[in-house]
């Protein structure tokens, strides 16, 4: 084997070892992303919702800043109810379809049904709520 091939093989092995320490993105978030794109007709990238207001993104506190932020708080609360019922919303996969920009759940029972309902309701809410650029990446220390 050529020395260059050995270096490439070594680099691949080392990078794979390092990648094992990176936590995977929860599986359900891929579905939620697709639901959001279904409902908003792809008009706004999902990352715009990841750091918006006091509730859109990781965690949340205080009073929502507007209708879109209220959608995120409702979604957080919905996931909280699902967790109280023994579900793991960020890891629960479910069956759904997009018909004429309306996400519809096909899952019929248990955690799949409740988590899908949380995501579908939020995706529809996001699509209907106005997006205010001033509320993107706000200082969340003001969220009281």
Curated annotation (Swiss-Prot):
Residues of the active site: 75, 119
Reaction(s) catalysed by this chain's protein: a 1,2-diacyl-sn-glycero-3-phosphocholine + H2O = a 1-acyl-sn-glycero-3-phosphocholine + a fatty acid + H(+)
InterPro entries associated with the record: PLipase_A2, PLipase_A2_Asp_AS, PLipase_A2_dom, PLipase_A2_dom_sf, PLipase_A2_His_AS
Leading EC class: hydrolase
Annotated EC: 3.1.1.4
Cofactor: Ca(2+)
GO molecular function: calcium ion binding; calcium-dependent phospholipase A2 activity; phospholipid binding
Coiled-coil ranges per UniProt: none
Residues binding Ca(2+), per UniProt: 55, 57, 59, 76
GO biological process: arachidonate secretion; lipid catabolic process; phospholipid metabolic process
Residues annotated as transmembrane: none
Disulphide bridges, residue numbers: 38-98, 54-143, 56-72, 71-125, 78-118, 87-111, 105-116
PROSITE patterns attached to this UniProt entry: PA2_ASP, PA2_HIS
Domain of life: Eukaryota
Subcellular locations according to the entry: Secreted
Gene Ontology CC entries for this record: extracellular region
Residues excised as propeptide: 20-27
Tissue expression: Expressed by the venom gland.
Segment forming the signal sequence: 1-19
Binding note for cofactor: Binds 1 Ca(2+) ion.
Assigned keywords, A-Z: Calcium, Disulfide bond, Hydrolase, Lipid degradation, Lipid metabolism, Metal-binding, Secreted, Signal
PANTHER family: PHOSPHOLIPASE A2, PHOSPHOLIPASE A2 FAMILY MEMBER
Function, in words: PLA2 catalyzes the calcium-dependent hydrolysis of the 2-acyl groups in 3-sn-phosphoglycerides.
Family the UniProt entry places it in: Belongs to the phospholipase A2 family. Group I subfamily. D49 sub-subfamily.
Name this polypeptide is given: Acidic phospholipase A2
Source organism of this protein record: Aipysurus laevis
